């Protein structure tokens, strides 16, 4: 893979997550019954950061959990046909909550769909919303994010790599050519 460009640096990611946190508060008319569910792996630290920002703005602690969607991969750049749910992956009560799924990149929509199925399987939420740092297009399912950090039309030959300091020791969104 060949490095192409930096889409977001550390400061841009912080600004983007701050905006998403404000949008979540505004759309939900506050933070009552909100639960942020990070989709493993990089969605979890992103969800924690958004929750910390909401707490800073509203002085209310927001519940954060995670959902583990295991992906079959041909290699590190392509997701196979069906994401699989780790049966013990949902670590939070979802009944009558406003669930906000948080992921790093929205691409085909298959991971988001699998995460929604996991939530519904564990209870009936009031509603499910989706927040993503990057929406790169190429949807295969009729899924759209409620909160988008950055829309980036990409070619299928490109790879969007989100790096978070909790996992990768730096914050950046980079584009590579396959």
From Swiss-Prot:
Its EC number is 2.4.2.9
InterPro entries tied to this protein: PRibTrfase_dom, PRTase-like, PyrR, PyrR_bifunctional
- Which reaction(s) does its UniProt entry say it catalyses? UMP + diphosphate = 5-phospho-alpha-D-ribose 1-diphosphate + uracil
Motif PRPP-binding residues? 99-111
GO MF assignments: RNA binding; uracil phosphoribosyltransferase activity
Q: Which EC class heads this enzyme's classification?
A: transferase
Q: What's the name of its gene?
A: pyrR
- Is Ubl conjugation found in the keyword set? no
What's this chain's function?
Regulates transcriptional attenuation of the pyrimidine nucleotide (pyr) operon by binding in a uridine-dependent manner to specific sites on pyr mRNA. This disrupts an antiterminator hairpin in the RNA and favors formation of a downstream transcription terminator, leading to a reduced expression of downstream genes.
Q: Name one GO biological process term.
A: DNA-templated transcription termination
- Name the UniProt key words of this record, in alphabetical order: Glycosyltransferase, RNA-binding, Transcription, Transcription regulation, Transcription termination, Transferase
Position of the signal peptide = none
Per the record, the similarity remark reads:
Belongs to the purine/pyrimidine phosphoribosyltransferase family. PyrR subfamily.
Q: How does it assemble?
A: Homodimer and homohexamer; in equilibrium.
Protein name per UniProt: Bifunctional protein PyrR
């Amino acid at each position: 893979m060949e490095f192409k460009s930096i889409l977001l640096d550390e400061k841009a990611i912080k600004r983007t997550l701050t905006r998403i946190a404000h949008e979540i508060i505004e759309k939900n008319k506050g933070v009552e019954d909100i639960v942020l569910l990070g989709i493993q792996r990089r969605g979890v630290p992103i969800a924690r950061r958004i929750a910390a920002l909401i707490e800073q703005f509203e002085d209310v602690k927001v519940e954060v959990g995670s959902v583990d969607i295991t992906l079959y991969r041909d290699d590190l750049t392509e997701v196979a046909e069906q994401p699989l749910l780790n049966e013990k992956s949902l670590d939070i009560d979802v009944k009558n909550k406003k669930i906000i799924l948080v992921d790093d990149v929205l691409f085909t929509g298959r991971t988001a769909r699998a995460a929604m199925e996991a939530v519904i399987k564990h209870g009936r939420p009031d509603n499910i919303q989706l927040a993503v740092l990057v929406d790169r297009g190429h949807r295969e399912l009729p899924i759209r994010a409620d909160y988008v950090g950055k829309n980036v039309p990409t070619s299928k030959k490109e790879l969007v790599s989100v790096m978070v300091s909790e996992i990768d020791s730096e914050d950046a969104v980079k584009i590579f050519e396959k």
